Amino acid sequence: MAAAAAAGPGAGAGIPGASGGGGAREGARVAALCLLWYALSAGGNVVNKVILSAFPFPVTVSLCHILALCAGLPPLLRAWRVPPAPPVSGPGPSPHPASGPLLPPRFYPRYVLPLAFGKYFASVSAHVSIWKVPVSYAHTVKATMPIWVVLLSRIIMKEKQSTKVYLSLVPIISGVLLATVTELSFDVWGLVSALAATLCFSLQNIFSKKVLRDSRIHHLRLLNILGCHAVFFMIPTWVLVDLSTFLVSSDLAYVSQWPWTLLLLVVSGFCNFAQNVIAFSILNLISPLSYSVANATKRIMVIAVSLIMLRNPVTSTNVLGMMTAILGVFLYNKTKYDANQQARRHLLPVSTSDLSNREHLRSPMEKPHNGALFPQQGDFQYRNILLTDHFQYSRQGHPNSYALSRHDV
């Protein structure tokens, strides 16, 4: 298993069977984390649906999630000794240069604020979709994310995919269409909200990886920064939409349920925070392909648990559409992973002469910018393809430069 390989060379050296025992313990830890991830994700979605069915204020639920992220991440970052974000460079040369690379002067307004707005908008849209349509259908629509990623990568990054990758999108489209036409509790606004959330998550996926690559910020540190900035977008929306409704509404039926509602909101915020941290930890332990399988399994678990707990009316054709879409997501991930591995094999030199030739033919050398090296356009496209599914979260990908990111839960 990939997690066993991540233990590092020399683990258990000189002790017969130590390597196998370490691999078994690593596998057991990954399995336990996956089960906990599934339970938190499924439970959190069921709790969200229960809240929104009796308390139809999706912005309030989103605000609780963002606040839980802002309150819970800083202690973890300190406990795991996650390095702080690099300082922002000034307009001129600094008299006391920093020991490491600096961020561009307009890094926060140009990159962080748009990503924070995307996080806010995606969270609100996702909760509106869960409010309007069943959890099972909302998660089926979220399976269209690979379609959006491929389209947006082609438009924004000029990234072309192989024919196999495009063909792997067909089951996703077919499954979502089948689930939509057979959905008994269909709602147009629920579908639009789910699609908007998925589109926004896809944009975040593309640009977050670009920001992480260029800035070298730790992924959990970036998550904390985006959450704190998203609060500034969330609070005005909450005041205008939900708080104003609380103050002027004559229907006070839900006031008597405030203690129960507040408890559910706390549970929902904790589940969202915990599953975010555990998802990053799992991705840090296993290969991207194994993670994609675990993520597809998690979506199946969420749909199954929601159907059992919430008793949504479904047909066999509706379930077939859901499973087809999820199977399509797995096929897409497998095809994309194989394509990236093939590209990596072409990139690696097989002899010293190959290495010399590639060094000679390399596009103009990276330009130093505030102490950091940034690649020119020549190999940007390949690096972007390689980073799409296998990024800095994986300990196998960057064992040396990201040793500090190997935080296990």
Curated annotation (Swiss-Prot):
GO terms for biological process: transmembrane transport. It is found in: Membrane. It is a multi-pass membrane protein. The modification Phosphoserine is found at residue 363. Pfam families: TPT. Keywords: Membrane, Phosphoprotein, Transmembrane, Transmembrane helix, Transport. Its main location: membrane. One of its GO terms (cellular component) is membrane. InterPro entries: Sugar_P_trans_dom (IPR004853), TPT_transporter (IPR050186). One of its GO terms (molecular function) is antiporter activity. The chain crosses the membrane at residues 50-70, 111-131, 133-153, 165-184, 188-207, 222-242, 252-274, 282-303, 312-332. It comes from the Eukaryota. Belongs to the TPT transporter family. SLC35E subfamily. Putative transporter. This is Solute carrier family 35 member E1.
